[in-house]
Each structure stands twice: as C-alpha cells, then as structure tokens.
Amino acid sequence: MSLNPRDVVVIDCVRSPMGRAKAGCFRNVRAETLSATLIDALFDRNDKVDPAEVEDLIWGCVNQTLEQGFNVARQISLLTRIPHTSSAQTVNRLCGSAMSAIHTAAQAIMTGNGDVFVVGGVEHMGHVPMTQGFDHNPAASKYSAKASNMMGLTAEMLAKMHGISRQQQDEFGARSHRLAHEATLEGRFRNEIISIQGHDDDGFPALIENDETIRPETTAESLAQLRPAFDPKSGTVTAGQSSQLTDGASAMLLMSAERAQALGLTPMAKIRSMATAGCDPAIMGYGPVPATKKALKRAGLKVEDIDFWELNEAFAAQSLPVIKDLKLMGVVDQKVNLNGGAIALGHPLGCSGARISTTLLNVMAAKGGTLGVSTMCIGLGQGIATVWERI
C-alpha cells in the first residue's frame, strides 16, 4: 500500500486491564497514574520515538472533576517522560471522548499542524462516579424526552422499536463474556494490555495483568434469572447484559506517514475516514448507524467491504439494533466483537473509544483483515465511527 505523506498512521496502541469500579483492583490507583503508565509504555515499546516530538497529548475524559479535573491531560503528561514543552488537552464527547481525541489528532496531522500525537482516554468510575457533580437542566425536557439522560431507558426503547427479545439480549451478553474469556486464555489481549500495579481482593499489592471484569461462568440461562434494571414492570434490560462500571485507560501513538517513514517505523494501520452523527436522544444507542454510514461513504466503502467490527456494547439492547440495521446479523460470529466487548470488559467512559480501536487493530493483525470499523453510541444522541486500514 502506498501512503501519502499526511496520512495518519497508528504506530502502537495499548490499554490497561479493566478493573471493577466497586472495590476493584485499581481502587487505590488514580486515573492519572493509570494513564501515565500507558504513555510511558508506548515509548518503552517504540524507542525510536523521541517524547520531545509529541505535539499534543489529547485525552478523553467524561467526568472532569476531582482527580480527573483541571485538564487531566496535562496532569497526566506531567507524570510521563513527555517534556513540559509539549502541550496537552482534555476532550469530552461523553462515551466517544477517546475516539474524539483520535479524530482531533488526525485532523491536526492531515492539515500539517503536527506530526506526532499521543491520544487516548481514562475514566476511574470508582473514584469519580458517572454523575458526580452533574446538575441537569429541568428545562431540557421541553426539547427532548425526559428519559434521555437515563441511558438504560433509552436502551429499553431501542429494544422495543427493533423487536429485540430478552432472550436475544441474554445470549448476546453471555457471548461477550465467553469470547473475552477465550481471548484471555488464548493470549489474544497480550499485545494490548499493559500490566499495572494494583491490589488484590485482600488488599495486598499485585501486578494486574488481566481484566478482572470477565465472568466466565456467565450463561444465557444465568442471565435470564436477573431482574430488569431500569423498567421493573415490563423491561428487558438487566445489569448482566449492560456494560459494566469499570476503571480503565487506553493510549495510542499517532503519526504522519512521512514522520513514521523517516523514523523507520512500521505502522499498524492508517485512518481511512472518520465521522460523527446525531440522533434522537431518546434512542441515543442508535448513533453508530448514521455515524458509520457517513464514515463509510467518506471512505468510498460499503458495509460488505469491512472485515472486522468493534461496536461498543453499552447494552445488548442497544448493540443488537445497530448490528441489525447495519445488516451484520448474519456475520456477527465472523466479524463483530470477536474478543467480547464492554458487557464483559466494561465501559470506562472516557477510555472506551481508544480501547475498542486498540482491540480492533489487534484483531485485524491477528486474523489478517484489511479494513475495520470501530464505532460507538454516545449519551444524549450521538454516534462516532472510524474506518481503519491495516498496513
């Protein structure tokens, strides 16, 4: 494949193990530390890259308060070997924050405003709960459904609109845990996970090497015993087929193709296209459909051209309508979330966009795919998507 000088390429991508938000392995580790460990690992793994070349550190984070406040990207940068002369910014597109960080860096590279960027995201949902400090405007209900801020109810709505049954959701949830467990046992996460010091259940220091969120014993039958979490009377969405609350971070090293070539680096992939799109906040989980269609159109591609997909599993009730309307139902087991997803691994809000992209790029490398799409829904009615081409 020939590369244009301003093509945006990925040199490397990593993530932390995923820890439970409630009394999990990272309960005594701060968000900045999780992130800084990954950034230094990128430079350890790619010693031809001088940290002084980093134009900007761009970090996704949703709840920017407490330890995640006051431009957490800069707080993180100051803990790494990136020099003080490089800049840093924190971005927030709710669930799509880390993918927006990727897009922001890519746009800068494409327009000649920098050659080397470190991007990613973090969310410590144990230390900074999802709605910490949020003050919802009551007047918003004049303009969008009052339940739009209640993500579980938006998933219930999508399931009803698309005829997704409780059994389908339970089977999809069990699939996520099964595939993530298999990926762990077979070492498929080994290249993307950076081990980080945390604590075990007894409080002793421990090197955390694997995701602690995966429940290998999960079956569709066991999930069928759970009560609805958001609509007790007639709901189908349960905690067991929803994304977990977790602590985690992810990081990527992005570069212009010409700088990568000058440094003698072999990129993993390049960005073919990017897109964001809006949808009705009451069905926020549908956002990946218009975003993906827009990104594919910009790349001159069709759904059938894509070898592998990573869809953030906010809820099974949300993922299945997206899969259905992207016409992927018949190829799920060959192409979609082959190492499990957020139902098993969790959804640390500001981290997930880079996490799913990292997992996708490793799946593409392992299985020989050329084209991949990472896409996710975003609270309040948005979607974001990236089309990747393996080099």
Swiss-Prot record:
It holds the Pfam family Thiolase_C. Pathway: Lipid metabolism; fatty acid beta-oxidation. The active site is at C95 (acyl-thioester intermediate), H347 (proton acceptor), C377 (proton acceptor). Catalyzes the final step of fatty acid oxidation in which acetyl-CoA is released and the CoA ester of a fatty acid two carbons shorter is formed. The gene is fadA. Its EC number is 2.3.1.16. Its main location: cytoplasm. GO terms for molecular function: acetyl-CoA C-acyltransferase activity. This is 3-ketoacyl-CoA thiolase. Belongs to the thiolase-like superfamily. Thiolase family. Keywords: Acyltransferase, Cytoplasm, Fatty acid metabolism, Lipid degradation, Lipid metabolism, Transferase. InterPro entries: FadA, Thiolase, Thiolase-like, Thiolase-like_sf_Thiolase, Thiolase_acyl_enz_int_AS, Thiolase_AS, Thiolase_C, Thiolase_CS. Heterotetramer of two alpha chains (FadB) and two beta chains (FadA). GO terms for biological process: fatty acid beta-oxidation; phenylacetate catabolic process. GO terms for cellular component: cytoplasm.
